[in-house]
A protein has these predicted regions:
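Extracellular receptor-binding modules and their adjoining Ser/Thr/Gly/Asp/Asn-rich linkers
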Residues: 19-80, 85-118
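N-terminal prepro-regions of secreted/extracellular proteins
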Residues: 3-5, 19-20
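Sec-dependent N-terminal signal peptides
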Residues: 4-14
C-alpha cells in the first residue's frame, strides 16, 4: 500500500510540474514626461512604443495580453487609439499605442500579462 501511494504521489508531482505555466504581469504608462511622446500633439497618425523586458525569461514564447485602465484625453476631440503588442519573444515585447485624426491623448496606461505553458 505504501508503494502504491508513493507511485501515485510521484505521478501526481510529475503531472503538476509538466503542466505548470509561467505567468508574469506588469504595467506600462505613456505620458508627456517621455521624450518622444507625441499623442497629444498635432493631427494625423502618431505612435509611441515602449520595450518591456521580462524579469525572468520564459522557457517558450508567451502569449501577451495588454489592457488600458488609465486614459486622459482632450474632451473636445474624438477618442481614438489602438493598443497592441509587437515583437513578442521569450525575453520581452514592445507595447505600442497609436492614435490618429485630431485625437489628443495626454496619458494612457494599463497592465500586461504574459502566459506560457512550460
Amino acid at each position: 500500500m505504501r508503494k502504491l501511494l508513493f507511485v501515485i504521489a510521484v505521478l501526481f508531482a510529475l503531472a503538476v510540474t509538466t503542466n505548470a505555466q509561467q505567468v508574469l504581469t506588469g504595467t506600462y504608462r505613456f505620458d508627456k514626461k517621455l521624450a518622444d511622446y507625441t499623442l497629444d500633439k498635432n493631427d494625423g497618425d502618431r505612435v509611441v512604443q515602449m520595450e518591456v523586458t521580462f524579469a525572468k525569461p520564459f522557457d517558450i514564447k508567451p502569449e501577451v495580453l495588454v489592457s488600458v485602465n488609465y486614459l486622459d484625453g482632450d474632451k473636445n476631440t474624438n477618442m481614438r487609439y489602438e493598443l497592441k503588442t509587437l515583437s513578442v519573444s521569450r525575453d520581452g515585447f514592445t507595447v505600442q499605442v497609436k492614435t490618429w485624426g485630431d485625437t489628443k491623448i495626454f496619458a494612457i496606461g494599463g497592465g500586461w500579462m504574459a502566459v506560457s505553458g512550460k
